Amino acid sequence: MAINPLKILFVASEVEGLVKTGGLADVARALPLYLAQKGHDVRIMLPFYKTIKRRDEAKLLVSRWLPTHPGLPDIGYRIYQMDLEGVCVYLLDCPQYFDRPQLYAENNQAYPDNGERFAFLAAAALHASEQLAFAPDIVHCNDWHTGLLPLLLKTRHAHNPFFQHTRSVISIHNAAFQGVFERQQFWAVPEIADYEQRISYDYGHVNLLKCGVLYADKINAVSPNYASELLTHLGAHGMASIFQQRAADLRGILNGCDYQDWDPAFDDFLPATYDVDNLAGKHICKQSLQQETGLPVVDLPIYGMVCRLTEQKGVHLLLPVLDKFLHHKVQVVIVGSGDPSLAAQLQTLAQQFPDRLAFINTYDDRLAHLVEAGADFFLMPSLFEPCGLNQMYSLAYGTLPLVRAVGGLKDTVVDWDADPEQATGFCFNDPTANILLDAMRRSLLYYLQDPEQFARVQRNAMNTRFNWPDSVTQYEQMYQDALARH
């Protein structure tokens, strides 16, 4: 069903192509792009960080002062504009908050004024929208960084004719990060005082994600299964009761996959391309992966893993059993950086098994693509995974994902045993090292004993698609439901 074009203000802390630390940035680029292709007037708003790419393309529009509180200083800022693949991007320039080497932290230490910084983003986004005469139908917020926006629409701007018809939605990309800060950081948002008890984390602290969830008109998680998990104590990171209060307004919408960048038939990073009808290029990619990572070029199954080295990604589940698995005739390639202690353990194992394990302690786009193409299996033993993108890439590249059945992983991977006809990979449930090892051994057994079925599952995987236009249709419905609220 076609809907009338909407004006959408999409506020995010990062956008792929300009500045990125994680998966939020991928969505913040793709979703506005595909919404615009449907005819909606989408404007992205984000901070003008020091690290923004293509800074010289930004055009200064206006300089303004953000009102704060009687007796307290207003905050000066400037609004810049640039284009991102045909979508208008507004950059909020306030050097005292955003002229820093990184986005959120330096040397693994969060900036102590992050609450104040992103309170400014929320207040300035609405102020700037009014200064630019862009009256949005929908303000689309993303994660804790924008959690104050829905509250400000219902307080500061409740009787502002400019926002009379504006409704807000918030997307939950990762509820583990909630934006909890001391109350005094929000001096520029006096409205918090009347709502502090409701949006507090504990005495004297404010929870920005909680604020967004309580006051947005509609809420979505980035996969249906993750939306269900947010209603449980195991999956909501202490916010189950808050999500339960808003259960009627919560839905799960699976992220799409950007097949323009992740398609083995047109991947410029690969030494050879391939598709579902001709996998010869995948074999060349496998040999290239072995050569580049220093592994012997032999005919063994390769298990790949590309991730941040964190507990969330399940690296601590893999480490206790990796040496046992490496005694099988396999090779493992792990690419990523993060926790130094996890990296040190992987480095030690790589030295013990130089012909079986390659560990590359950095992230590199080209190598990430080569792992997806050259491996036979892709490991994602995540403790939680709101949506996940690498399993989608793996499916497209015919590299069977081996995942823990949580969040979006459960929505996107069909287990070999659970449904042999529709299978696209391997799933396991319990977050223990031995259960993970069992799943890895099961995948190895099937690879060796049933190559015909392996080829069928590989074809199933490569024919699976998670297209953004399908997701956009669901977002459009959520916007309509939000606008229907009075």
UniProtKB/Swiss-Prot annotation:
GO terms for molecular function: alpha-1,4-glucan glucosyltransferase (ADP-glucose donor) activity; alpha-1,4-glucan glucosyltransferase (UDP-glucose donor) activity. One of its GO terms (biological process) is glycogen biosynthetic process. GO terms for cellular component: cytosol. It comes from the Bacteria. SUPFAM superfamilies: UDP-Glycosyltransferase/glycogen phosphorylase (SSF53756). Keywords: Glycogen biosynthesis, Glycosyltransferase, Transferase. Signal peptide: none annotated. It catalyses: [(1->4)-alpha-D-glucosyl](n) + ADP-alpha-D-glucose = [(1->4)-alpha-D-glucosyl](n+1) + ADP + H(+). ADP-alpha-D-glucose binds at residue 20. Its EC number is 2.4.1.21. Pathway: Glycan biosynthesis; glycogen biosynthesis. Synthesizes alpha-1,4-glucan chains using ADP-glucose. Belongs to the glycosyltransferase 1 family. Bacterial/plant glycogen synthase subfamily. This is Glycogen synthase. It comes from Aeromonas hydrophila subsp. hydrophila (strain ATCC 7966 / DSM 30187 / BCRC 13018 / CCUG 14551 / JCM 1027 / KCTC 2358 / NCIMB 9240 / NCTC 8049).
